[in-house]
Amino acid sequence: QKTGIDMTAALSVSASDSKDSQPAPDGKVGVSKLRTFADTIRDAKTNDLASLKTYLDNNGGGIDTMVKAIEYDYDIVPQIYQSDTSKATVQVSPDQSMKQMEAGFGSGAFGSMVLTNAFYQMPATSSLYTSAYDVVAGSWPSGANQVVLVLDEDGNIPNLFEYTLGLKDHKEFDDLMRSYYQGTLGGKSQSGAQSGTQSGASTATYDYSAILGTTFRRVNAFDKYTWDDTYKVWTDRSSDADYMKKLVDGGQQLTISGIVKPNSDKGGALRQGIAYTPALTYRIIEEAAASPIVKAQRAKPDVDVFTGKT
């Protein structure tokens, strides 16, 4: 990626990272504590991706003889929601529950933090990971409509994922983030506020059957905009609850087809989270390229389609 902040540790907890972490019972998915955020924020870096790709494509340094595969990751974050919209539309990719913190501390750090969530693309080369993981339930995903839940070596997931998966009410996590934000800015020490976020750590376990088959809905970012014929601009409808409910209900369904965990403590090419196939990324790219809003912007590159101004 061009720029980023290393937030992997915030979402990935191994047995060696926490003395409180215990292996999950056989046939169960356990939950480990969410790490404190302050310990995982790193300086953002900028990379020259164009030059790097040219170098790799031309076998720079004889790299073809030293690697099994070269993987490219696109700066695309799927817009994914929980399927149940009966109470509200709950976006889980990118997760919106950190808005209070972003508002208080600025979008620079936490904007990147929000983009690093449970969902991520798995490598296109399956040989990079299949032998390093055991399928404990279901099967590896195939196609753009399936995803896989990746556990740690002890069979656990961070407690954050309980909210993502709908095992706990996502509103609880919203309140947790709000408490963190208010505690930090209200005079409490940062460590004290963080201990509050960890107090919600769960010791629950879940049957594989409670997670396998869980569905989500993906929508296209451009579908959140509709054309305003009066002002001749594209209008953001993401704050329109009725519009968003209809959009999410009709979105692409993603289903957890399997649950996997590393077959050794060395792990593999995957991290804890919900991994989707490259086919989903390609579908998002294709649908975006064919969308009216993108076509309109390309037709008039000097005009901002959101404001109508040059």
Placement of each model-derived feature along the sequence:
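Basic-flanked hydrophobic alpha-helices used for secretion and membrane insertion
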Residues: 1-310
